[in-house]
Amino acid sequence: MSDQGRADALSASHEGSVTQRKLVPDHDLVGQIGERHFGEIFGLPLGPIHLSGKNDDHKDFEIAGHKVDIKTSRKPYNLLVEEGKCEGRTIYVHVGLNGSVPTLLGWQWGKRLLQSTPKPFNTPYTCHYMPVRQLRPIRELMEQHKKSLADRK
């Protein structure tokens, strides 16, 4: 299924949800592009679309037994995770989107993001955050992923 097809199905599943916040019209498409790009780079399949509209447990992928939540943005100055939804043992990956071209910018543990004082960042809610220049390098996460795959053999 295409990114647009997955985004349309995801949008339809959220219809009427009080927890779904769309900050831009193509919110779901932006997220799908980032998730697909991460999956391609890391050799991981995209997970099923949660057509029930229920929370997906903030898990887009799993690496070495840890949840991975992909955060994609067209203005990727800071990795943002909504206050109350940031989990210490989750890996958050920041993907920047320039037009339709995604770039993996970095990652960080939720426990480090939780150390930030939440701010609104032009959103209707406050977010834990980390500037992109302070994120851990993607190559480090890739090395952990390769090691966990090798350990399974």
Mark where each language-model region is.
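Nucleic-acid endonuclease domains
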Residues: 1-64, 70-153
